[in-house]
């Protein structure tokens, strides 16, 4: 380090606080910095910023900072007039004691209060992607050199290349998704996930039973994206009768900060999707989460959510307009034979090589460009599969079809209708039916039915119960209701 990086050493420069300031002058913003909202030091490794322990800062940076100051003190002592030599020697002796572990950690702790950063200061460029070989401008395709000032905590882990090594990845996609329009759509939704801002507010269901390759696609994309990909526990998306407390740690939320692509896999048969959680995670509102033993952090969402499953979750209200606008079902219709399915292991290994991950990253960037040029525009196969999903998972619709009559000239007190719904749910084996409040809200979405109020109470106009002896039970599409919650 050169002499002009710091001021000349004097008495004031040898205090603990002065040493902490000197540490940040030498290394702050370019090599290390402290984030006080999560209580962690960040270190720049030449590509991205990452959390490090306090001991790393003490041993690698504070110690070196003291060594540099000692060199300056010794140099000035040797060059000073004889009258000051003794004083400088005393300072030098005293300062050597700062090389012990306690003094180094004291210096680091003092440095933590010098212009600390927040985690929200990182990953703020949604149209840039940090790759192993540079900082990629998604809009122009220009690859720029890495800089600490880019404030990235994520990296793909592989290089961006403008042309693929081979056609292997694209050829496999043609086998897994033969329909060209659906394959083109998947290309665009995967590419759209590269942007660090939420524009579409959608969740993508990859649905299909058996060996169909959907898992290979999702996991290969995640492998190519490295730090930009994360896994969301499937239970987060499912309805539960137990609500988390306000102060409960939510690491699954905190882990989404800065992520572009998050996936969740395989719900059990009969699980019910949490509409409120899906709306929250796919919306554009600020998210707030907390890791264990840390303060909460707030951030704008940047992730795009993909859900792969053999058994799609049930819905409590299939007429919920917000959910219909969010859920897109991509059908995987090809089922490979057992012999063909055994290739998946080898295929997965092949797609995880560095060359293949670079090809997939190039394909994703190409998909982003297609998305920006064309928009998403779901093809008929996706529209049909999405419509079928809502029709087959319409609990309110099944209740009305089996137990009710819709007519302008009829009405029923709303508590009587809910009581009938609870009885129907019990007979259907639904263990966790809608609450009365959720049921009343769902009824507001039923065409031709409206909520009214009189002195006698609240009622629904346009609907009434069919006499019990005139009802014809229907079969629940997709199998038994007994496992529903």
Question: Where would I find each of the regions flagged by the language model?
Answer:
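Feature primarily recognizes SF3-like P-loop helicase cores of small DNA viruses
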Residues: 2-39, 70-485
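Active-site-surrounding "flap" and adjacent substrate/cofactor-binding loops of secreted or lumenal enzymes
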Residues: 62-66, 70
């Amino acid at each position: 380090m050169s002499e002009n990086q710091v001021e000349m050493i004097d008495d004031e420069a040898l205090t603990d606080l002065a040493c902490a300031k000197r540490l940040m002058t030498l290394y702050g913003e370019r090599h290390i910095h402290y984030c006080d909202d999560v209580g962690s030091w960040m270190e720049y490794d030449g590509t991205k910023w990452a959390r490090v322990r306090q001991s790393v800062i003490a041993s690698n940076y504070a110690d070196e900072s003291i060594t540099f100051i000692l060199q300056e003190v010794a140099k000035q002592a040797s060059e000073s007039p004889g009258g000051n030599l003794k004083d400088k020697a005393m300072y030098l002796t005293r300062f050597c004691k700062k090389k012990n572990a306690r003094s180094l950690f004291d210096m680091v702790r003092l440095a933590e209060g010098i212009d600390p950063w927040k985690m929200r200061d990182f990953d703020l460029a949604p149209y840039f992607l940090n790759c192993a070989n540079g900082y990629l401008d998604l809009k122009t395709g220009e690859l720029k050199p890495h800089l600490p000032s880019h404030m990235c905590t994520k990296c793909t882990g592989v290089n961006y290349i403008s042309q693929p090594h081979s056609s292997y990845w694209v050829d496999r996609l043609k086998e897994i998704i033969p329909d060209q329009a659906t394959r083109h759509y998947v290309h665009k939704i995967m590419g759209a996930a590269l942007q660090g801002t939420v524009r579409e507010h959608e969740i993508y269901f990859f649905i299909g039973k058996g060996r169909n390759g959907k898992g290979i696609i999702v996991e290969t994309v995640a492998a190519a994206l490295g730090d930009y990909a994360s896994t969301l526990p499937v239970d987060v998306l499912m309805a539960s009768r137990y609500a988390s407390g306000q102060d409960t740690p939510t690491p699954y939320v905190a882990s989404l900060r800065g992520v572009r692509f998050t996936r969740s896999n395989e719900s059990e048969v009969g699980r019910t999707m949490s509409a409120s959680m899906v709306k929250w995670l796919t919306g554009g509102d600020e998210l707030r989460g907390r890791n264990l033993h840390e303060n909460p952090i707030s951030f704008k969402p940047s992730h795009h959510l993909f859900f792969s499953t053999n058994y799609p979750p049930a819905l409590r209200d299939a007429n919920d307009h917000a959910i219909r606008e969010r859920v897109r079902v991509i059908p995987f219709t090809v089922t490979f034979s057992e012999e063909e399915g055994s290739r998946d292991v080898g295929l997965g290994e092949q797609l995880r090589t560095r060359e293949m991950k670079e090809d997939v990253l190039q394909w994703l960037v190409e998909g982003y460009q297609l998305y920006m040029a064309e928009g998403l525009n779901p093809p008929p196969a996706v529209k049909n599969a999405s419509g079928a999903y809502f029709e087959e998972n319409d609990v309110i619709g099944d209740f009305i079809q089996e137990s009710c009559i819709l007519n302008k000239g009829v009405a029923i007190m709303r508590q009587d209708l809910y009581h009938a719904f609870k009885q129907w749910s019990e007979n259907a084996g639904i263990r966790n039916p809608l609450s009365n409040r959720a049921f009343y809200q769902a009824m507001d979405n039923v065409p031709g039915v409206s909520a009214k109020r009189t002195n006698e109470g609240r009622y629904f106009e346009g609907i009434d119960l069919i006499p019990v002896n005139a009802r014809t039970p229907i079969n629940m599409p997709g199998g038994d209701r007994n496992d529903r919650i």
